[in-house]
Amino acid sequence: MSALSSNRLPNRASLVTNRAFSALEGFLHVEAFSGIVLLLAAAAALIFANSQYASVYESLWHTPLGFNFGHFTLSWDLHFWVNDALMTVFFLVAGMEIRREIHEGALADFKQAILPIVSAIGGVCFPALIYLSFNFNSEHTHGWAVPTATDIAFALGILALLGKKIPANLHVILLSLAIIDDIIAVLIIAFFYSTNIDPSGLAIAIAGIALVLFFQWIGLASAWLYILPGAIIWWGLMITGVHPSLTGVILGMMTPVFPTRTLVAPLTILSNAMQILQEKNIKTDLHHISTALKKMRKGQRDMIAPVIRVQKTLHPWVAYGVMPIFAFANAGVSFANFDLSSHESFLVVLSVVIGLFIGKPLGIITASYLAVKSGLCRLPPHMTWTGILLIGFLAGIGFTMSIFVSMLAFKDIVLLDSAKIGVLCGSGLSALAGLGYGLIYIKRNKNKKVLHNLNGIK
């Protein structure tokens, strides 16, 4: 029997490496198609909430779920598990993406990051001011943050529908802006929607953070081991009064961006595995083949930074599992008891719709224009103001994040439903505007290229 051909192994190793380091491309791909799943989940929730099965839909989320451990009982309803526990995983992935962008992405270079940072700030301030102008001197001012959020999945999903004719720079700026938007949303939740702060829980959360740092210091690389300190942080934040799902952001931002240190270098492990596979008669020795392949997998794993490895594993679960479940649990608004003749409800709906549909693009393009004209930053190559406006429309798709904030802002069920309807309408209008304007944007770019080619011929 001849030895394994050496030319096949590098191809396999190259394939594995390419898969591991295409994190950004995979992120965009998953986010884009998960937008469709989110839309279906939201539509299903609305159908159930306004059908003969509405009572079943409502009672489902009030189903108690928990466990007993001796005399210790832990039990919450299903709605709590979705919004406070499951969403922690979403914020974990968001935190990791923020960490990566700061380390090696669009936010790593401050000059490059100025445009999306300024745009995101404008896209938060304008919708908030619009909301406050409609609800000034009322009891509903605490809902000002509802129209400030951006749903990355939906925004990138609409962009994906427009095809590959959209410049790559536009994808990068939209993603960077949405990530900064997430950072601002996290800060808003932490500082404005955390009530009745109890300092006793802070010590528990700090202990959990210290345990994470200790695990990292001794070189523990398995993500499963960090569930314990994560649970401690989550419990501490809940006692403190801060929304416990922000545990995900803390863990995500603490995830190492460099490969974990090992006793044997990953390249040495891969080299040893290659030597084993290149030995004669290896095809007949299943034990040696299995051992070599295990070493290759370990070497590959050790070469990849935990922030990339864990995010790559969790991201599809969040995009196709956590977010659709959240949408199905919270987008079900019953129109039966909704009354637009109520002045309070009408103002909440109107301010959220206008904040998302008009405030977002207006804030983004105004802030960007002022930043560029003042010399603070420049537009990236091949980026035009029409492209910035397209980003503004897509950023107005608040959906899941806006619904999440509305649930923290409103305790009154009528006003909460009003805010949700405003989010659904505003996000829907923004999506349609983004899709329609995107088609116009593509056509304009195509015509410009045709004219450029004709001028070149002349």
Swiss-Prot record:
Keyword annotations from UniProtKB, A to Z: Antiport, Cell inner membrane, Cell membrane, Ion transport, Membrane, Sodium, Sodium transport, Transmembrane, Transmembrane helix, Transport
List, alphabetically, the Gene3D superfamilies matched: Na+/H+ antiporter like domain
> Which InterPro entries is this protein grouped with?
Na/H_antiporter_dom_sf, NhaA
Membrane topology category: Multi-pass membrane protein
> Does the entry feature the keyword Ribosomal protein, yes or no?
no
Provide the GO biological process annotations.
regulation of pH
| Family to which the UniProt record says this protein belongs | Belongs to the NhaA Na(+)/H(+) (TC 2.A.33) antiporter family.
HAMAP family, per database record: NhaA
Q: What is this protein called?
A: Na(+)/H(+) antiporter NhaA
